[in-house]
Structure formats: C-alpha cells, structure tokens
C-alpha cells in the first residue's frame, strides 16, 4: 500500500506577512505563506496548522471564556490561510503574551510543557486516524519564539509513537523558508496584505521577492525510538494532571497506569516480549468487548474497584486523554485582576499524560502482531512477530533472536 503525507505547520501572526515568490527545485509559488509551496511539494492529504491562543487578542471584541479564546484564535488564523488545500484543520495551543487592548491589559501565561504535551497529542492522534501508511512533514517557516522548537520536539516524538503503533519505518521531513528579505519601504508596502481582502496584496503590480523553501531534514524514524522518551518522575507518573483534586476520572486513570501502562512500557523497554504479550492480550481482548463491559467504556467518577485488573482497552486510554485535556481547559478560563485580564492555566499536564500516549502507541502496535482469541497462551509465532516492535535497534533485535532461538530449541525438545 502506497504512503500518503500529512503535513503540520506552525504559525505566528499571519496578518503582517508579505507576498513572496516561494521557490523549491526551480518552481515558484506566489503566496503570503509557505502553505501553497508546501502543498505543491508534498501534495499532503491533510494540513494541520498549529497556532497560539494569543491570536484571540486580534479579534475586535472582548474575550469571555476559554472556548471563546480558542474559537477567536481559530477564526482569525483561518481568514489568512489563502491556499487551495483539500483538507486542513487548525489546532489552538497555549501561548504567552502581554498586550494592551482598549482599557485593559491582557496577560496570557502558559507552561511550555503544556504546549509540548498538547502538540504531541494532536500530531499523534491526527496521524493514527489514517488507514494508509504515512509520511509526516513539518513546516516551521512561520513559527515564532518557542513555537518551532517545541513543535519540532513534539513532532519527532509523535513520529516515533506513530512508528511503533503501525510497526513501520516512518519518513519525516522538516521545511523552513529563508528569511524574508529587506526591501525598499514603498515596495514593502505594496506587498502587504490588503486589509479588506487579506489574500491579495495592496498593489496588484507588486513584484514579490524570491524566497527559497528549504528541506532542512529528511530522516526515517523507527519504532525503537520511542524509548528515547520513556522516563518519568515517580511522584507524578500515575496522574495526567498536577492537580487532580476535582478530577473525577483520576482514580481510574491511576489504576490504568499502575495496572497496564507502567508494566507494559517497562516490558517494552527491557525487550521482555513474553511479559509484553501477556500484558497486552487482556487489554486487546477488552477492545472487542461490549460497551457495557468494564474495559469497554468508563463513566466519569468510576473508581478503580469497578474495573477488573488488566481489562483496560485502547478506548479507555483515548477517553482518559480527552478528559484530561477537557479538565486542563477548564482551568484556563480568563479572569480579571484590576485592569488586567489574565489567561493562565491553573492546572498542568503531568507525566502520566505522556505515559498514556506511549501505552496507546505500544498497544496499538502489538494489536497487529498477536491474536487475542486465546487469552492465556502466548505462541512462539507471536513472540517472533513482536520482534518487529524493536525495529531500529540492532542490539535488542539480536538479543531477541537469541532468546527466540532458545525457545525454539526447547519446543523441539519437548515435541521429540
């Protein structure tokens, strides 16, 4: 099956970008952003834009809630897309700014680990929705401050998660355009956006400068690279948020992490494929259970005593990730302090959030390699299949080959 491309791009404020002739391999595209040249070069099935929630301040009216902040930021960015994309989405992540607006001072505060956690979630979840094998690309041309660095870190980690979830080598590419050149003031003015029609320049006879569009990185990411990102603070690994006092799902999440995530991730990192299969089989069997079964869906506030040990499923993980994000968003509501309107997260993502993502990826990969019809039995064929989880590490695959050879030898002796 041939692969397709999903592209991610990080944006600052697009209102002030000027028209350019972006060039790659001799071909040029006139546009206010690199989206058009990215689309031409990569022909992506889908493009996901990552923007900051601080763009909400560009809207004329006052912000009233965090949902309002997200919608204003998304609508503002969408107005400037100006590209013929078959499919695109805009994801709004937490930003940092202090800005005077009217009679108030708006202060946006954010923890950069929250930005990274949400970017990781969005990139990974967008990727696994596709049935066909993917190549992943990232454009950091228009990111500002911390955004390109954090998004690249998350993109790389998400590619590793995607690779293990699909048991494949995943090709990634990263692009960045050259800086926009300094022009004469009159020329620069002509190349600015027309405020009434932001997808056209102020002057139709403007001649935009050539700006090179560069491929910065092209690499293969292998499943084993997930282990680069495994490592948790003991005191926070069993929770997805720092403050769980009013989070009804916390006890169920804690149970899932204790009973499935930590043993599964540990077994994977150690190359303990027998334990890996024994841990995964009940969870994958629960995947096919009815919604009324304990492992099928979790009600808010359900305690860990309601769910039998090891009956957690991929669906449970997805539900808990979504609920953790919803709970985090509830703590980012705007509030007034004197003449300041502050948007600040009262909660933060804890290491357990990343542990759930890693569990989801590893479990998804195992799902394609073993049978769940016989819960108590792990076959030699399944162990040989599980070796595919370790693509990218010659050392681990060599050690597993030796262990499997021993088991094969013992099997032969038993059958003699």
Where are the language model's segments positioned?
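Long, low-complexity, Lys/Arg-enriched
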Residues: 1-135, 150, 156-416
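Acidic, metal-coordinating catalytic cores used for nucleic-acid/nucleotide bond scission
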Residues: 140-148
């Amino acid at each position: 099956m041939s692969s397709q491309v999903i592209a991610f791009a990080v944006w600052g404020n697009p209102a002030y970008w000027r028209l350019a002739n972006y060039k790659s391999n001799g071909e040029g595209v006139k546009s206010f952003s690199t989206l058009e040249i990215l689309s031409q070069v990569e022909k992506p099935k889908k493009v996901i834009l990552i923007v900051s929630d601080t763009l909400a301040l560009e809207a004329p009216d006052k912000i009233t809630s965090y949902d309002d902040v997200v919608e204003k930021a998304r609508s503002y960015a969408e107005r400037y897309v100006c590209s013929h994309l078959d499919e695109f989405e805009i994801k709004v992540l937490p930003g940092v700014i202090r800005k005077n607006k009217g009679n108030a001072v708006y202060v946006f505060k954010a923890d950069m680990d929250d930005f990274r956690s949400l970017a990781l979630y969005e990139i990974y979840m967008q990727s696994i929705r596709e049935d066909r094998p993917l190549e992943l690309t990232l454009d950091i041309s228009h990111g500002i401050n911390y955004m390109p660095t954090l998004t690249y870190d998350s993109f790389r980690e998400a590619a590793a998660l995607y690779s293990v979830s699909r048991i494949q080598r995943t090709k990634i590419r990263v692009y960045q355009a050259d800086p926009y050149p300094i022009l004469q003031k009159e020329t620069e003015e002509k190349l600015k956006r027309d405020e009434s029609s932001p997808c056209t320049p102020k002057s139709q006879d403007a001649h935009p400068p050539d700006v090179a569009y560069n491929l910065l990185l092209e690499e293969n990411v292998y499943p084993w690279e997930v282990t680069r990102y495994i490592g948790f603070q003991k005191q926070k690994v069993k929770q997805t948020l720092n403050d769980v006092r009013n989070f009804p799902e916390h006890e169920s999440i804690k149970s899932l992490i204790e009973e499935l995530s930590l043993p599964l991730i540990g077994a994977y990192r150690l190359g303990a494929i027998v334990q890996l299969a024994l841990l995964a089989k009940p969870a994958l069997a629960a995947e096919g259970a009815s919604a009324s079964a304990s492992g099928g869906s979790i009600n808010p506030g359900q305690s860990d005593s309601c769910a039998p040990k090891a009956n957690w499923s991929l669906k449970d993980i997805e539900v808990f990730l979504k609920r953790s994000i919803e709970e985090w968003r509830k703590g980012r509501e705007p509030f007034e302090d004197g003449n300041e309107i502050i948007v600040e997260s009262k909660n933060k993502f804890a290491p357990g959030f990343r542990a759930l993502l890693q569990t989801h990826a590893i479990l998804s990969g195992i799902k394609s390699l073993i049978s769940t019809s016989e819960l108590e039995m792990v076959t030699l064929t399944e162990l040989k299949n599980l070796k595919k989880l370790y693509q990218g590490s010659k050392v681990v695959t060599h050690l597993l080959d030796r262990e499997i050879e021993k088991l094969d030898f013992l099997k032969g002796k038993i059958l003699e």
